[in-house]
Amino acid sequence: MERDFLGLGSKNSPITVKEETSESSRDSAPNRGMNWSFSNKVSASSSQFLSFRPTQEDRHRKSGNYHLPHSGSFMPSSVADVYDSTRKAPYSSVQGVRMFPNSNQHEETNAVSMSMPGFQSHHYAPGGRSFMNNNNNSQPLVGVPIMAPPISILPPPGSIVGTTDIRSSSKPIGSPAQLTIFYAGSVCVYDDISPEKAKAIMLLAGNGSSMPQVFSPPQTHQQVVHHTRASVDSSAMPPSFMPTISYLSPEAGSSTNGLGATKATRGLTSTYHNNQANGSNINCPVPVSCSTNVMAPTVALPLARKASLARFLEKRKERVTSVSPYCLDKKSSTDCRRSMSECISSSLSSAT
């Protein structure tokens, strides 16, 4: 079939397309007009409708089979023929297959199918001719049989590819405001908290953290033991049965011998003051010290510590005696001392 669009080509140039459809099917195709889609770039005459209805001369020339010359120019069939062939594609493999000879693959132009309605593509062939092709019926021209209409590369207009709306529509409109507090590894959530209350809580928390914390030292209280006994007259009891409590004073005087051993020689004793109420109860003891400047410790030393201290002193005494320069027996040391004292006394008497 040969078509001349916009007077750019002559009618003498041969063009051939192998058609296997009848003329009755071409007549049944709807004769539509196409509006020029580039009206804002060309002259006012482009707003007219371009008819694709085949003429009588074209129908007579379609009855024969022609070969496409290797001139580099190629013109597709009319829109009505392509539309009619795509409608009859599913009937049979013979009627639905359309073959296009591949004259020159480097000089062919293929239109990309677009799914938008009313969109037309305008191409210029290498030979100088221009043609219009409907994108809904565009087919590749490389000699491949076409069994189905082309697939669109763009989504339909109704589909939504992406959106930038805030995803808060799923939340209910009247949802209560919540306050979440993270403190000491725990999470606390409170409902119905207004922004003003939240700000006030944050201010209180900030002010509370800046306030200095005053810690009072823990007070140690002595345990007071109350002894409850029957009515017993303390004056009738012998003094040996009276309880006594002894305290070791750190400031007490101590006697030291020549070997460096120390012995505690002073202690404090306390007696019970009996304040009998109705002759039945005995109150706690009150310590009485001989001197006011000596303070008795609150806790007495245990007996085990006393025994270990005594053993330590004995061991130290033994070490000191073994290291002394005059390692003599006790008897010899006493004899030497006596002889020295006698010599000193005799010398003093002779001097006088």
UniProtKB/Swiss-Prot annotation:
Residues 17-26 have a biased composition (Basic and acidic residues). This is Protein TIFY 6B. Repressor of jasmonate responses. Jasmonoyl-isoleucine (JA-Ile) specifically promotes COI1-TIFY6B/JAZ3 interaction. Acts as a negative regulator of MYC2 function. Feed-back regulated by MYC2. Keywords: Jasmonic acid signaling pathway, Nucleus, Plant defense, Transcription, Transcription regulation, Ubl conjugation. Homo- and heterodimer. Interacts with COI1, MYC2, MYC3, MYC4, TIFY10A/JAZ1, TIFY10B/JAZ2, TIFY6A/JAZ4, TIFY5A/JAZ8, TIFY7/JAZ9, TIFY9/JAZ10 and TIFY3A/JAZ11. Interacts (via TIFY domain) with AFPH2/NINJA. Disulfide bonds: none annotated. Residues 1-71 are annotated as: Disordered. Residues 172-207 form the Tify domain. Pfam families: Jas_motif, tify. It is found in: Nucleus. Changing residue 182 to A: No effect on dimerization. Belongs to the TIFY/JAZ family. Signal peptide: none annotated. GO terms for biological process: defense response; jasmonic acid mediated signaling pathway; regulation of defense response. The gene is TIFY6B.
